[in-house]
């Protein structure tokens, strides 16, 4: 689904091509190692790493983000939650590296028992206008996408271009191997919004990660009591095509998974900002219920941006 790499700290300096290449190699090595080793060994290694980072305070931005969810100062975020959050984040990557080698049909049958709210998706497709599934970066959204392909066929999503191009292509190939249709956010033959609209008008499913867009194109919303910006794409697609906008959430349940599709948001007003706020409210409820599984290691709120960055947003 869109991006899926929000926690990465990839270099932006064009002179750092060596570092970018090393990053690509590191992910390639991780992919091979995780597939080659027994599951219990990989799980223990990832969990040990999570506990180590948690004991040393964990990523500062993750702590700040969880503080907003809990409504406490960053220093008051419980250490067990930090540890659980890092373990959840590591589990996501562990499963990403293994997912292409797993029997998808067998796994989909297992997931059939834990996915709720499918009647909302079925109703949307029965109406013939398509469906937009909007999700935050929580749990394992790639696993949910794999299930969707097995039960409803290929869906369409969008991916940000990473650098180096080889790393970007590695993740595109990975998601296409799961049956996703992945459009580049930039540099494609056609604008992604145009293609997504076309897919919806053909009664297809579009899936978008939708809780963060700290750019001038994002719309300002209230999120856990503070202002941030979220992408307008999901709401705009629903308004312009008539597709159902279905908030969706993924989380982990023990060693299993939880997935829930929620009722379609009311988009009849055509007010993209108001619809996006309603989506933000739904996300907030779901993230608060499963805070450890929200994998947001980058700044989420405007207050965490530099003053110069905030000034750029205000100059729109």
Curated annotation (Swiss-Prot):
Catalytic activity field: a 2,6-O-bis(alpha-D-mannopyranosyl)-1-phosphatidyl-1D-myo-inositol + an acyl-CoA = a 2-O-(alpha-D-mannosyl)-6-O-(6-O-acyl-alpha-D-mannosyl)-1-phosphatidyl-1D-myo-inositol + CoA; a 1,2-diacyl-sn-glycero-3-phospho-[alpha-D-mannopyranosyl-(1<->6)-D-myo-inositol] + an acyl-CoA = a 1,2-diacyl-sn-glycero-3-phospho-[alpha-D-6-acyl-mannopyranosyl-(1<->6)-D-myo-inositol] + CoA
Gene: patA
One annotated GO biological process: phosphatidylinositol metabolic process
UniProt binding sites for hexadecanoyl-CoA: 137, 175, 240
Taxonomic lineage from the root: Bacteria, Bacillati, Actinomycetota, Actinomycetes, Mycobacteriales
UniProt protein name: Phosphatidylinositol mannoside acyltransferase
Active site, per annotation: 137 (proton acceptor), 211
Disruption phenotype: Essential, gene silencing is bactericidal. Depletion of PatA causes a block in the biosynthesis of PIMs, resulting in severe changes in the composition of the mycobacterial cell wall membrane, which correlates with the loss of viability.
Enzyme class: transferase
Organism expressing this protein natively: Mycobacterium tuberculosis (strain ATCC 25618 / H37Rv)
GO cellular component, one term: plasma membrane
Membrane topology note: Peripheral membrane protein
């Amino acid at each position: 689904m869109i991006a899926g790499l929000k926690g990465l700290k990839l270099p932006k300096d064009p002179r750092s091509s060596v570092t970018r290449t090393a990053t690509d190699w590191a992910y390639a090595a991780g992919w091979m190692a995780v597939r080659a080793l027994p599951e219990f060994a990989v799980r223990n290694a990832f969990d040990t790493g999570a506990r180590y980072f948690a004991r040393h305070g964990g990523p500062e931005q993750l702590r700040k983000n969880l503080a907003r969810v809990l409504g406490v100062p960053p220093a008051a975020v419980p250490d067990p939650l930090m540890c659980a959050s890092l373990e959840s984040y590591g589990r996501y990557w562990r499963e990403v590296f293994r997912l292409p080698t797993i029997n998808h049909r067998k796994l989909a049958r297992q997931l059939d028992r834990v996915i709720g709210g499918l009647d909302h998706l079925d109703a949307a497709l029965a109406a013939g206008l398509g469906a937009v599934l909007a999700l935050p970066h929580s749990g394992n959204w790639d696993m949910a996408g794999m299930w969707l392909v097995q039960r409803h066929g290929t869906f369409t999503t969008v991916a940000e271009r990473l650098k180096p191009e080889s790393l970007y292509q590695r993740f595109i190939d990975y998601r296409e191997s799961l049956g996703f249709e992945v459009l580049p956010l930039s540099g494609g033959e056609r604008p992604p919004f145009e293609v997504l609209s076309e897919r919806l008008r053909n009664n297809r499913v579009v899936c978008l990660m939708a809780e963060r867009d700290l750019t001038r194109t994002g719309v300002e919303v209230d999120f856990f009591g503070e202002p941030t910006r979220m992408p307008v794409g999901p709401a705009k697609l629903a308004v312009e095509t008539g597709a159902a906008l279905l908030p969706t959430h993924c989380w982990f349940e023990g060693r299993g998974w939880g997935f829930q599709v929620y009722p379609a948001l009311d988009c009849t007003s055509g007010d993209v900002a108001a619809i996006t706020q309603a989506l933000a409210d739904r996300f907030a409820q779901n993230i608060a219920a499963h805070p450890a599984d929200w994998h947001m290691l980058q700044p989420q709120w405007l207050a965490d941006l530099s003053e110069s960055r905030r000034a750029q947003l205000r100059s729109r």
